[in-house]
């Protein structure tokens, strides 16, 4: 597991010369939640108009996170897993080993994206990734995320500051689902959760991460120099 201090020391990208890639991908392994959150915020605060966007692929040790709309009563019982109150949208969720997390540090204006469009893009990337494994997944009206036969397999939550996003999405690969029984996932009582392993998929988190990354890269609009697509 990468130490929090190492992650927090990731340097913000300085203004970049022409030809710099529009997207930097960091594969971070299993990293503690709070240092990762602080590093995302620091990156977002320090970035300039020329800083390349980044996607961080990783896992977290067991942790519950409670978004800005979260209500503490959705933590049904104390099972010894830390609870962290954070600044993303949404309610309570669980992260743990075996769950793929992708954080999207994106300049929305530069790619001509609105917040709702980025949310839809993330959902579609998960749907496309699962389709590549032969699993049919879908959205659910009024309940952000990705579902298979009504059970949640992918969660998402964002924070946007000055037109720049951080946080992102989580996809259950072979994560232990037991901790979800101690919460109302995303604020929904009795919501079932599933993982890719339940459908006979043996790929590990790193392998699934590469498939998800391909889907995200395919769906993300290019960086437009003027900050918006040409008319």
From Swiss-Prot:
Pathway this chain belongs to: Protein modification; protein lipoylation via endogenous pathway; protein N(6)-(lipoyl)lysine from octanoyl-[acyl-carrier-protein]: step 1/2
The reaction(s) catalysed by this protein are: octanoyl-[ACP] + L-lysyl-[protein] = N(6)-octanoyl-L-lysyl-[protein] + holo-[ACP] + H(+)
Per the record, the domain of life is Bacteria
- Taxonomic path: Bacteria, Pseudomonadati, Pseudomonadota, Betaproteobacteria, Rhodocyclales
Protein name, per record: Octanoyltransferase
- List UniProt keywords, sorted A-Z: Acyltransferase, Cytoplasm, Transferase
Which family is this protein grouped under?
Belongs to the LipB family.
Residues binding substrate, per UniProt: 88-95, 155-157, 168-170
């Amino acid at each position: 597991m990468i130490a929090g201090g190492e992650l927090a020391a990731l340097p913000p990208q300085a203004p970049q010369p022409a030809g710099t890639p529009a997207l930097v991908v960091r594969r971070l392994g299993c990293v503690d939640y709070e240092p990762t959150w602080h590093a995302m915020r620091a990156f977002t605060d320090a970035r300039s108009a020329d800083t390349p966007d980044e996607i961080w692929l990783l896992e977290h040790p067991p942790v519950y996170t409670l978004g800005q709309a979260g209500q503490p009563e959705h933590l049904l019982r104390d099972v010894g897993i830390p609870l962290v109150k954070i600044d993303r949208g949404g309610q309570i969720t669980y992260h743990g080993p075996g769950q793929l997390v992708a954080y999207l540090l994106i300049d929305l204006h530069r790619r001509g994206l609105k917040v709702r469009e980025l949310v839809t893009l993330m959902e579609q990337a998960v749907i496309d990734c699962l389709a590549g494994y032969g699993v049919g997944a879908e959205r659910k009206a009024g309940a952000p995320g990705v579902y298979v036969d009504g059970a949640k397999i992918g969660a998402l939550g964002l924070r946007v500051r000055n037109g720049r996003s951080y946080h992102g999405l989580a996809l259950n690969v072979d994560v232990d689902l037991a901790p979800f029984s101690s919460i109302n996932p995303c604020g929904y009582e009795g919501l079932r959760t599933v993982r890719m392993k339940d459908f006979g998929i043996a790929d590990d988190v790193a392998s699934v991460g590469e498939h998800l990354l391909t889907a995200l890269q395919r769906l993300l609009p290019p960086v437009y120099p003027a900050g918006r697509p040409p008319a």
